[in-house]
């Protein structure tokens, strides 16, 4: 049983890697073929590894793990925020601030400041302050919310980190590894998989692909927390959705 079907992966464009000249040779074992200068990801491996990632995240959530979703590129920002929120977890979907994990104490101080400004407004303090000061406070709050709003209520450093595009989020991955935090990631053909604990070979540049994978991991968290199966499983049908079909789809899309 698979949590994501081959058909779903194909329809979302998960199989499209980067141009061959931009590849990382360490991803060779996850590449099925090359067509028209584009690497094609081996979706049979993606199906299997997505199952493993689902189980890993589900089991972590069942043990009350704090899970941080990270994806700051525009293709990932919305899905990361929406799915982390749906799963009752935390996210960073704008620029990663250096030291977010390794200098957590300083980040907590900034979060405290954000909460303080919000409390001032709720208690009516803004009404008695000069307009210029209120404008400055609003500007400060907006900036803090942009970068820290998704982790405002995160109780501690995360137990697991899920990353969309570890090539872009190298600083985040390095901080997690330094602290021994396992990293689950969508890894495209241009990335280095060595620092990733749970790899999902996938196109991390297509909005639909990011949404598909990210939503399944959110399902895993919900299942782990509630003890219910939040995801629809699919029988692996290698005849109907064989890896050879990927080549046909790629050739069709590239013609």
From Swiss-Prot:
Coiled coil: none annotated. Pfam families: Ribosomal_S2. Signal peptide: none annotated. HAMAP family: Ribosomal_uS2_B. One of its GO terms (molecular function) is structural constituent of ribosome. The keyword Nucleotide-binding does not apply. Belongs to the universal ribosomal protein uS2 family. Keywords: Ribonucleoprotein, Ribosomal protein. GO terms for biological process: translation. This is Small ribosomal subunit protein uS2. GO terms for cellular component: cytosolic small ribosomal subunit. Gene3D superfamilies: Glucose-6-phosphate isomerase like protein, domain 1, Helix hairpin bin.
